[in-house]
């Protein structure tokens, strides 16, 4: 993220799908073909990856002077960079600190949050924004973490950007901000659609997710400039897919020590590369 002039909020290590994780998935009825790390902060709390998400939680809580951010948008410049997994585990780790948290699936083009939590998606955000103002049915409970509520996307609409820019969406965020300590929002990739830019003006700040050796710095710079022009704030970058040799996690009596190192590279680098121990 040095190339972008943004803070690095966390480095998330690459996760191997171990036999332990497969057993957990089978136990919970989750598909083994689904993202194996979506609920890692619950299902494998002692893993290096879960620890990295707790580091992200700490980074976010100290990212604003005065008070921690309340409404946080999580997005990426391109698809398949881990934004939904990052949004989910950010919400989980915040809720694990014993505060009320809600996560909203605002990816109305390719919603995924309901499937990770094992929830029905026949009703959700799009119903509310289209006139059904029943907030009780909108807020779903995830039984493994009572402090976390989930707002699924609902049926995919023909006009996602119009719904997300509506007065109803702004009113809903105000309502949820009065009810929850933190509101985490997942959106479509930033470059492909205007949805993330629209939502960025309605939240306290944005978390930009990137994938090591995949993400385009050029596209991320474009998004950063677009957000800057709108007057919105980017808290920093979460870099996914870091190889195990790049990040060290040591555990001492239940506590952890997190450190990372990054190599210098030149300004012509087209991708955000993996960081290596020096």
For the regions a protein language model found, what residue spans apply to each?
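Short acidic/glycine-enriched loop/turn segments that link adjacent beta-strands
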Residues: 145-147, 193
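N-terminal glycine-rich dinucleotide-binding loop that anchors FAD/FMN and/or NAD(P) in oxidoreductases
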Residues: 119-137
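Conserved catalytic-core segment of NTP-binding enzymes
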Residues: 1-5, 118, 130, 140, ...
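Short, conserved active-site loop motifs that form the nucleotide-linked donor/cofactor pocket
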Residues: 147-148, 235
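Residue-level preference for the first positions of well-ordered beta-strands
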Residues: 71-75, 100, 148-150, 182-184
């Amino acid at each position: 993220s040095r190339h972008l002039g943004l803070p690095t909020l966390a480095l998330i290590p690459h996760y191997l799908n171990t036999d332990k994780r497969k057993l957990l998935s089978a136990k919970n009825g989750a598909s083994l073909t689904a993202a194996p790390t979506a609920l890692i902060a619950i299902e494998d709390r002692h893993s290096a990856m879960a620890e990295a998400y707790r580091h992200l939680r700490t980074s976010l809580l100290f990212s604003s002077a005065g008070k921690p951010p309340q409404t946080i948008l999580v997005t990426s410049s391109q698809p398949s960079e881990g934004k939904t997994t990052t949004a989910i585990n950010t919400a989980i780790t915040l809720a694990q600190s014993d505060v009320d948290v809600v996560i909203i699936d605002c990816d109305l083009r390719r919603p995924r949050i309901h499937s990770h939590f094992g929830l029905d998606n026949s009703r959700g955000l799009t119903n509310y924004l289209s006139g059904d103002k029943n907030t009780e049915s909108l807020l779903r409970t995830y039984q493994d973490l009572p402090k976390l509520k989930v707002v699924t996307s609902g049926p995919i609409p023909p006009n996602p950007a119009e719904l997300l820019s509506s007065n109803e969406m702004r009113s809903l965020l105000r309502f949820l901000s009065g009810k929850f300590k933190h509101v985490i929002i997942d959106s479509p990739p930033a470059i492909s659609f205007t949805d993330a830019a629209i939502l960025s003006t309605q939240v306290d700040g944005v978390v930009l997710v990137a994938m090591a050796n995949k993400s385009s710095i050029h596209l991320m710079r474009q998004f950063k400039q677009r957000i800057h022009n709108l007057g919105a704030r980017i808290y920093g970058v979460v870099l996914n897919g870091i190889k195990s040799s790049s990040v060290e996690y040591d555990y001492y009596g239940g506590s952890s020590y997190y450190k990372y190192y990054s190599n210098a590279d030149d300004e012509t680098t087209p991708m955000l590369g993996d960081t290596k121990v020096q």
